[in-house]
């Protein structure tokens, strides 16, 4: 089969690789769409020791089951494979399983390929009216769904339901959409890039600004750099909540004194639970997350150029979806 293989820092190649082989209780999936995630970019830039070359990246994917009793079923893939036996798994927090695996990280190859093998329990069927490109957005949308859910659960019930989202990339946009789906009507996205901001404003569905002087009960940091954490620390109201989902850099930015004296809650949020993933998929199917028309589709064979364009900051769309059969 063909795959886009990470071969070293800023090097990916579209080439032949051994066919994906399902294990026991797994299905072979013909990949129809796979999105480029920020973590794929971290690996591409050589910033992720967990993803050593050579490796097939990609974990945001949808496709069709090949063979077996579910042959032909259209599915979106939950890439987190958990043990199902530990206390975290049994309590519905599979994302905290100590033995979890994820495709695109050894020992599991990723979805920037024509085929991938996945456990049956990680597949959610996709109705015919939902495109594969839209279904592939379930994974990044679930990341934000999880962050928003935790943030709203922590928010004091007397506080206004309004939120600031820092960052207009896919995770930030997804957070704004999840907030709206959870009945938070006053949502502002801060995005400094003129091109990205103009692109998002053109959709007409999002309130995107370059900067704001307001403060907010809930702040979602969808970037995760010291500068954005500093902004979150400044913009959150006393008694409010910061939900941190971005993984830009490891340290710096938080005003711990202010957070302590004003009882600001800080929540680290990692991926999603299986239930978050299912709920996100259903929200997509029901149209509660909008038209999801803020993506750019490219052929997987042109993946090297897509990574370069993202590296050079010349992509206006929040998400590039790679199509293996284009």
Where do the PLM segments sit?
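Glycine-rich cofactor phosphate-binding loops and adjacent beta1-alpha1 units
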Residues: 154-164, 182, 197-265
């Amino acid at each position: 089969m063909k795959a886009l293989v990470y071969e070293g820092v800023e090097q990916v190649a579209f080439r032949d690789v051994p066919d994906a082989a399902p294990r026991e209780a797994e299905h072979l999936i013909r990949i129809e769409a796979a999105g480029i995630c920020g973590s794929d970019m971290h690996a591409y830039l050589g910033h992720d020791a967990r993803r050593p070359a050579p490796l097939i990246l990609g974990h945001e994917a949808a496709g069709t089951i090949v063979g077996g009793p579910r042959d032909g079923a259209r599915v979106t893939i939950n890439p987190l494979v958990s043990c199902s036996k530990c206390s975290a798994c049994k309590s519905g927090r599979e994302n905290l399983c100590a033995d979890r695996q994820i495709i695109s990280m050894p020992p599991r190859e990723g979805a920037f390929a024509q085929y991938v093998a996945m456990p049956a329990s990680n597949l959610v069927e996709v109705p015919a009216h939902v495109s594969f490109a839209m279904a592939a957005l379930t994974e990044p949308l679930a990341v934000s769904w999880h962050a928003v859910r935790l943030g709203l659960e922590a928010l004091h019930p007397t506080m206004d339901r309004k939120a600031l989202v820092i960052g207009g990339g896919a995770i930030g946009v997804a957070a704004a959409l999840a907030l709206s789906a959870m009945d938070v009507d006053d949502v502002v996205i801060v995005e400094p890039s003129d091109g990205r901001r103009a692109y998002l404003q053109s959709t007409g569905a999002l309130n995107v600004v370059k900067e704001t002087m307001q403060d907010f009960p809930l702040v979602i940091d969808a970037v995760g750099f010291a500068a954005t954490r500093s902004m979150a620390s400044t913009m959150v109201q006393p008694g409010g909540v910061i939900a941190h989902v971005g993984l830009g850099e490891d340290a710096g930015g938080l005003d711990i004194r202010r957070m302590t004296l004003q009882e600001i809650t800080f929540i680290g949020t990692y991926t999603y639970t299986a239930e978050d993933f299912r709920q996100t998929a259903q929200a997509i199917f029901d149209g509660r997350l909008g038209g999801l028309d803020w993506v750019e589709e490219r052929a997987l064979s042109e993946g090297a150029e897509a990574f370069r364009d993202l590296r050079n900051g010349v992509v206006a769309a929040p998400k590039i979806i790679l199509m293996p059969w284009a």
